[in-house]
């Protein structure tokens, strides 16, 4: 039986230690990563994965919503949604926050955050990143040869830990203007 204040254990990639940035250190309680097939039916499995890891976290509900949006975008808009595609989810916890990162297999298009209230925007798309930007304290992404990673940080992240706030990624977004 799991207690609400315990950090769940998982047999995947777990790292415990400190991340350094400049002069400061941030103690990471745990970090997990898991790859899922890039198909719509696996979004719920990814949500359960994150929900289990964030039991007792005040960021759990928002993190699950953001994960769902990012995973769905990866399946619908990137090569991860093609036959045999994968989506990797990474969850990192520290005492005052959580980071959710979703890595897909890339695409030629770039992520766009659309304000659903703006006139002229398609009514049925573009809301996922807007919602993620509203719920997360920080949202950022980058591309590399393996694909695209979009990461959302929740909670308190000290200014000297920009690698967690912007998740070491270009295009940081702290909300939509």
Predicted regions and their residues:
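Conserved beta-strand-loop-beta-strand hairpin that lines the nucleotide-binding pocket
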Residues: 1-33, 75-177
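STAS-typified acidic loop motif
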Residues: 33-43
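Conserved ATP-binding N-box helix of the HATPase_c
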Residues: 58-85
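Conserved short strand/loop->alpha-helix "switch" segment adjacent to the catalytic nucleotide/phosphoryl-transfer site
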Residues: 45-68, 121
């Amino acid at each position: 039986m799991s207690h609400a204040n315990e950090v769940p254990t998982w047999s995947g990639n777990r790292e415990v230690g400190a991340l350094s940035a400049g002069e400061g250190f941030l103690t990471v309680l745990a970090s997990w990563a898991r790859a899922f097939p890039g198909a719509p039916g696996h979004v719920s499995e990814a949500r359960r994965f994150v929900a289990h890891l964030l039991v007792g976290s005040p960021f759990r509900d928002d993190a699950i919503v953001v994960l769902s949006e990012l995973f769905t975008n990866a399946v619908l808009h990137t090569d991860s949604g093609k036959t045999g595609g994968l989506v990797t989810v990474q969850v990192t916890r520290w005492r005052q926050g959580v980071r959710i990162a979703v890595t897909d297999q890339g695409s030629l298009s770039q992520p766009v955050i659309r304000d659903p209230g703006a006139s002229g925007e398609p009514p049925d798309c573009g809301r996922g990143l807007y919602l993620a930007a509203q719920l997360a304290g920080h949202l950022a992404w980058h591309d590399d040869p393996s694909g695209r990673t979009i990461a959302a940080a929740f909670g308190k992240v000290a200014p000297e830990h920009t690698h967690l706030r912007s998740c070491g990624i270009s295009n940081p977004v702290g909300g939509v203007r």
